[in-house]
Amino acid sequence: MAKQTWKPGNMLYPLPAVMVSVTDGEGNDNIITVAWAGTVCTNPPMVSISVRPTRFSYDMICKTKEFVLNLTTEELAYATDYCGVRSGREVDKFQELHLTKEKADHVKAPMIGEAPVN
């Protein structure tokens, strides 16, 4: 078989959707759903996510250089979908979805209390 060149894209399926919580450090927090997330290193712990520059959360991440990955459950399916299709420019997703902000140990971005793993 001859080699093929494919356009950039996601070739590893399935990828879990994760909810990423962010802050701008000035009292504004947001949640974005991403499907492109992965482990980069375990020591020190590092993960990667892919966020388009046009997304509301992008500038927050660039400004603070931090975020929290929040794993989802079946119970969080609606919230996970909602956070992927609604912009934080228009709605406070924590308030709208009645999600609990919890203080993280090492970053300023809040954790989602309902997520089983942050």
Question: How should these model regions be labeled?
Answer:
Residues 1-34, 38-118:
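Active-site-proximal mixed secondary-structure blocks
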